[in-house]
Amino acid sequence: MSFALEIKKLKRTGFFPAFLIGALLASLFPVVNMAARQEMFVNQPLAPLEILLNANWSMMATLNVFLVIIGSCMMYYGEFANRAIEKLHMLPLNLHVLFFSKVFLLLAAFIPVLAIEEAVLLFCSKHWFSEKELQLDLLLGNAGFSLAMLLPVILLMLLIASLCKNMWISLGAGVILLFSAQTIYRSDSILAKIYTFSMPYQFLTKDCTPEKLAPLFLVWAGEILLFGAAKMMLIKFRRTPV
């Protein structure tokens, strides 16, 4: 019921067209990059997918995170407009369920986005690296990994958007967090590994093992629990609707 209600509300906004445009822009980047600098990439002694991800994933991840920011702001802009969220609090609805319906809807919106992006990476692999192994298993694994890495960002961004009646404040906060992630995600510091907005910049390679990924997923799970618990506490103790 709550999930269907969220979809119905978002149909009145530009939410779904925005995600389609974002997916197409993110997918266009590796094609243009490969076409413009083909010789730089095809001669590298790496697997095709690793070459493509090293060259393009930072931009693709940036666009994906920006879609999270835009999507979160759109979801709560509709709630705060004309005090709609206050009316929701008067209805016999579970507010925890409403929030997590938004989380899962935003996460589900990235399934077709990542499918388009991975399909384009597959096309680039076949077109420019036809003589090398395609690594379909790693491609599919990376799609699932990328979707998982977006979940803490979605939770945090929806939490921020739910606290800001002015959409431009939550949008600005999200952009600041995104730009700060861009300054640290390439470093080997602990902050780069645990910072929520830098997680989507990471991707799987053939060298990734469960032992190497275990610390990352421990932080990932901790952030999910932290942001989810923070929202539940706000709903319980805050007097104004969130």
Question: What are these regions, as identified by a protein language model?
Answer:
Residues 18-24, 164-182:
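Pore- or pathway-lining transmembrane helices of multi-pass membrane proteins that form conduits
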Residues 32-52, 171-242:
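Terminal transmembrane helical anchor/hairpin motif
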Residues 23-70, 100-165, 204-217:
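Secretory targeting signals
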Residues 1-10, 76-89, 143-166:
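Cytoplasmic juxtamembrane interface segments
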Residues 37, 41, 77-80, 84, ...:
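Membrane-interfacial segments
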Residues 1-23, 241:
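Aromatic- and glycine-rich beta-strand/loop motifs that create alpha-glucan
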Residues 75-107:
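Helix-loop-helix units of permease transmembrane domains in multi-pass membrane transporters
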